[in-house]
Structures are given as C-alpha cells and as structure tokens.
C-alpha cells in the first residue's frame, strides 16, 4: 500500500503545483490529513455532503477534488451549517482531502483543456497564458467545420445542456478552450484570432464582447468541462500505484 505523503508528493510534483501559487485561489495539495496509509481513492469535481456520504459508504479514505474546500481569497471565517457537517464527516471518518485546481485544468497530459480538445478531435496549436502560466489551449479543426456540427459534438461528448451563442462565422477553424470559469479570457482574442470560444460558464460583459467581436461561444457548463482531469487522475493513480480508485459524480447541473 502507498502512504499518504508518498501520494501527495507524487501528485504535487506531477501537477507542478508550485508554479500556480500566485494565481490560484484554491490551496492545492493536501488540505485535510486523514489516515497515513491509502486504501481507496475517490476523485470528484467538488465536495458536496452527498459526495462525502458516498465516499464513506464506499470505504474511501482519500478524496481528491478539483475544487478544494480551503481557499486563499475567502478563507474560513465560520464553521457552521452544511460546512460544519462536511468537516465533521471528513474528520470523524479520517478521510484525507487533496485539491488540485488550476494545475489540473492546465496539465499538458491529463488536464481538462487538453482532454476537451482530444474528445472533440481537435489539434492543439497554442496555449492561453495568464502571468506566463498556460491556463487554456487554442486548437484547430482539420477542416473548417460548421459551428452547428461542433456544437452537436459538444452536446454529445461533453454536456447535452451546453449553450451555443452564435455571434460569429458559420464555419469555424480556430477554437479557444478554457474549462471552468474562463469567460474573461475571451477578451484576449479578436475575431481574427479565434472563430469559437469555449468555456464552462459565461458572463454578461463577456457576451457583449463576443457580440461586438463576432466570436461564437459555446458554454459547456462549469461542472461538465471539469470532469476530465479528475477522471484521468483516478486512472493514472490506479495504473501507477495499483490502488483502487473511483470517480464520484455529483448531481451538479451548472
């Protein structure tokens, strides 16, 4: 069996968490220390009370989440209500909690953005940077595709409830992809640079920009755009350490 801190050390190095220190609101790495020996690992996008209950029923003692429960910006001011219940169940059941946020969006092998491009059979040609850190990708269709065909693929392979904002060309070639809450990054582009911008959730001011710049937008859904990294992580750990892993799906819609 692998020890907890062996797992933490491997993931911290593999996902290169130190370089995201300045820009990530989430505390990456080990957030809550549980048992020292890893018996069964679950991955998830966010930790709800239902996810914790499922982990307890499944004998999970390490929970790896994309959205951690400890943030730099907000901090923990009060431990009350549903948050208190979360912590109580985690601590009483000696579950370790690890979080990997931007490192798992950006990773060049198992990250959310790379995975979305692969699922849609797109060729990555460039990276989208924030403070010299790659947080998204620009990808190319082999042939200029109908925007409606791309949208159909997204609905089929990522989220049937994805939304198309058709403000640009009927046929698209260059596609920018940023999973999660990446709306603001559309303002890095003009219609001459990308034909389609894809992200997890969108904002009104960014929609105005898309209209004025005539850039198509597909809103994939925040949750749906971020299941890939944690799923890939579960598979990686299973293959590398021969430990039992499972992906826990949430009832989240947005």
Question: What does each model-identified segment do?
Answer:
Residues 1-254:
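Active-site catalytic microenvironments in core metabolic enzymes, especially phosphate/sugar-handling
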């Amino acid at each position: 069996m692998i020890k907890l801190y062996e797992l933490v050390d491997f993931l911290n190095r593999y996902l290169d968490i130190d370089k995201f220190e300045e820009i990530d609101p989430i505390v990456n790495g080990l957030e809550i220390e549980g048992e020292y020996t890893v018996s069964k690992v679950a991955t998830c996008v966010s930790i709800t009370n239902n996810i914790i209950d499922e982990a307890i029923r499944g004998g999970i003692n390490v929970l790896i989440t994309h959205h951690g429960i400890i943030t730099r910006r907000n901090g923990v001011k009060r431990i009350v209500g549903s948050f208190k219940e979360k912590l109580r169940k985690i601590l009483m059941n000696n579950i370790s909690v690890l979080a990997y946020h931007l490192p798992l969006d950006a990773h060049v092998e198992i990250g959310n953005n790379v995975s979305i491009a692969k699922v849609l059979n797109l060729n990555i040609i460039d990276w989208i940077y924030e403070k010299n850190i790659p947080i998204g990708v620009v990808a190319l269709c082999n042939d200029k595709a109908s925007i409606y065909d791309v949208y159909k693929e997204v609905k089929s392979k990522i989220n049937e409830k994805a939304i198309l904002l058709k403000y640009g060309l009927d046929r698209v070639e260059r596609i920018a992809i940023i999973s999660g809450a990446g709306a603001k990054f559309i303002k890095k582009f003009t219609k001459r640079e990308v034909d389609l911008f894809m992200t997890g959730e969108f904002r009104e001011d960014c929609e105005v920009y898309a209209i004025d710049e005539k850039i198509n937008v597909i809103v994939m859904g925040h949750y749906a755009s971020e299941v890939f990294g944690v799923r890939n992580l579960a598979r990686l750990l299973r293959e590398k350490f021969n430990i039992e892993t499972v992906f826990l799906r949430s009832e989240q819609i947005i």
